[in-house]
Amino acid sequence: MTAPAPRPGIMDIRPYVGGESAIEGVDRILKLSSNEGALGPSPKAMEALRAMAPEMHRYPDGGAEDLRKAIGARFGLDASRIVCGAGSDELLGILCRAYAGPGDEVLYSAHGFLMYAIAAKACGATPVTAPEVDLTANVDNLLAAVTPRTKILFLANPNNPTGTYLPATEVARLRAGLRADILLVIDAAYTEFVSRNDYSGGIELVEAGDNVVVCRTFSKMYALGGLRLGWAYCPENVAGVLNRVRNPFNVGAPALAAGLAAFNDTAYAELCKSHNDYWLPWLSGQLAELGLTVVPSVCNFILVRFPKDAGKDAGAADKFLRSKGIIVRAMGGYGLGDCLRITIGTGEENQLVVAALKEFVGA
């Protein structure tokens, strides 16, 4: 007798491994591996979490009505077309389950978020990548990779792990070049950090047709990664599909309470944005002065390329940083083995990273 077998393709999935948070034998850790908010969550979010603790025996609002209404009011959106999830990851997975399956293809750029391939394989679809140009998604290459089997195109904009982005005009050109039956999912997890006049999170494209979804998260700017909360803005038909497929109580009450408080604390969000606006160029400039190649980023992290010389490569740098208690993200899983991704931390953390890498390169 054989054991129950999963669907074909499931065992081909390489499990996602998040950024490490501990080093054996090291007490003080600088965790700069997961692009978490440098300043932590809003004090008002923490207070909301404490205040709702006595009600944790109650089921949450399955429709996340208060949060959806707040998001809709802020951005001028139809709240009935907003769907909340346990992180935007859950929503990406549900979209794959609902719109792709065996024999279908899910398309994304070569260095797109690893979860896209996992979500595709989990529903039996085939992940397909399109070449990038200068570590940036390329519209022509994406459109050239479309086949009759393409059902979903994921576009991380800005992109993790490269930190690069496509201007709004290019994203609009991408959407215009797609068949109407292909779902374009714009993963805008880092949109709050972007300070570029030619950038858009893509909401206007959702309003313009029936095949664009924008996903957002509370894990980055709002620093609520531990609670798992995200949202999607969709055409009416797609929102209806998501609400049929998602679990009825997919977002917990603690996440909803803290998320609403964080969302309404605009002053704290502005503080976090200002922090990143200062330290992102500072850290990028400091590492460039050490002779390292820093990919221009609009996010709360930078991708740093190291020489391939033995002892000076990314692997050696990672090992050296870990010896100092500094955890960054190795990029081998993205096909960028000569790079490390470093989250923008507190001012002290950023200075310690520079000091450690200065020692490593012998500057």
Curated annotation (Swiss-Prot):
Annotated GO biological process: L-histidine biosynthetic process
SUPFAM superfamilies hit by this protein: PLP-dependent transferases (SSF53383)
Residues the record lists as N6-(pyridoxal phosphate)lysine modifications: K220
Molecular-function GO term, any one: histidinol-phosphate transaminase activity
Stretches of the chain forming a coiled coil according to its record: none
Gene3D superfamilies per the UniProt record, alphabetical: Aspartate Aminotransferase, domain 1, Type I PLP-dependent aspartate aminotransferase-like (Major domain)
Superkingdom of source: Bacteria
The protein's annotated pathway: Amino-acid biosynthesis; L-histidine biosynthesis; L-histidine from 5-phospho-alpha-D-ribose 1-diphosphate: step 7/9
Keywords for the protein's UniProt record, in alphabetical order: Amino-acid biosynthesis, Aminotransferase, Histidine biosynthesis, Pyridoxal phosphate, Transferase
InterPro entries: Aminotransferase_I/II_large (IPR004839), HisP_aminotrans (IPR005861), HistidinolP_aminotransfase (IPR050106), PyrdxlP-dep_Trfase (IPR015424), PyrdxlP-dep_Trfase_major (IPR015421), PyrdxlP-dep_Trfase_small (IPR015422)
CDD domains, A to Z: AAT_like
Record-listed E.C. numbers: 2.6.1.9
Catalytic activity: L-histidinol phosphate + 2-oxoglutarate = 3-(imidazol-4-yl)-2-oxopropyl phosphate + L-glutamate
Cofactors demanded by this protein: pyridoxal 5'-phosphate
Stated family: Belongs to the class-II pyridoxal-phosphate-dependent aminotransferase family. Histidinol-phosphate aminotransferase subfamily.
Subunit details: Homodimer.
Protein name listed in UniProt: Histidinol-phosphate aminotransferase
Organism for this UniProt entry: Paramagnetospirillum magneticum (strain ATCC 700264 / AMB-1) (Magnetospirillum magneticum)
